[in-house]
Amino acid sequence: MAMTAEVKDELSRLVVNSVSARRAEVASLLRFAGGLHIVSGRVVVEAEVDLGIIARRLRKDIYDLYGYNAVVHVLSASGIRKSTRYVVRVAKDGEALARQTGLLDLRGRPVRGLPAQVVGGSVGDAEAAWRGAFLAHGSLTEPGRSSALEVSCPGPEAALALVGAARRLGVSAKAREVRGSDRVVVRDGEAIGALLTRMGAQDTRLTWEERRMRREVRATANRLANFDDANLRRSARAAVAAAARVERALQILGDTVPDHLAAAGNLRVAHRQASLEELGRLADPPMTKDAVAGRIRRLLSMADRKAKQDGIPDTESAVTPDLLEDA
């Protein structure tokens, strides 16, 4: 099951005891999923949702809280409609429901944001407002670089009201207009987790957090692997360059090279990929890596001085781009 469906399924099964919170959820769900229509001179309230369990929850709450009967119509997937949709409709008592839920103000005008009783309600009402909005038009993407919890809004006023509700819950949300559509987006991973818990989707939050942690562990492992690969490549190139310089140094000095420096140089040439510590163990008698490094350093310095005196290419000339490319 996709993350969005998991959240909606869990929220639809959540038991809410507070009447005020249940009313806030219904008002928000109707505001974000529906609209008011005039049919034969009467106000009809409709809400279109994507899961049958959401439609049944809304129908039950409308009856329990307001005493009105709602009818659920099933719109099967066909044509441009990719999935089955469910329309909850209150026709006979539509105007009364619209007034009681705050979709119409005292003068009978449609409310553009969220109802005043929801905006000025308790923290529990703010949580319920988010729950209703998410059930109506929410989405949650998988954890990742572009993860987000998002709600499509019927207008900028509703979006700003939802941002304000999130602020009351200690969550930073942003209202944005994308391709002419108003949306409220939460991108921070910690904020997404906190909001899921606030809405009542704790189980889904745990699943989401687990996937998020697994992804972060994989990303960290990949970064470390890339880092290790880069280090290995640098080490290999450095070893090849050092061996090439030592080889050139032995050519420049010829028979004049001191035996102990020649021994260290020949070890470097013979074991191009070995570390200084490994070269020290291969020496006879064994020596420390610092001793090996010191002898090779003196060998190169001596050869470069002689090359300068004789006017010939020094040890650096042996390190060509082609040589490093092949390393």
Curated annotation (Swiss-Prot):
Pfam families given in the database record: HTH_WhiA, LAGLIDADG_WhiA, WhiA_N
Record-annotated DNA-binding residue ranges: 277-310
Keywords: Cell cycle, Cell division, DNA-binding
Keyword Cell cycle: yes
GO molecular-function terms, A-Z: DNA binding
GO BP: any one term: cell division
Gene3D superfamilies, per database record: Homing endonucleases
UniProt family annotation: Belongs to the WhiA family.
NCBIfam families tied to this protein: DNA_bind_WhiA
Its biological purpose: Involved in cell division and chromosome segregation.
Annotated protein name in UniProt: Probable cell division protein WhiA
Chain's gene name: whiA
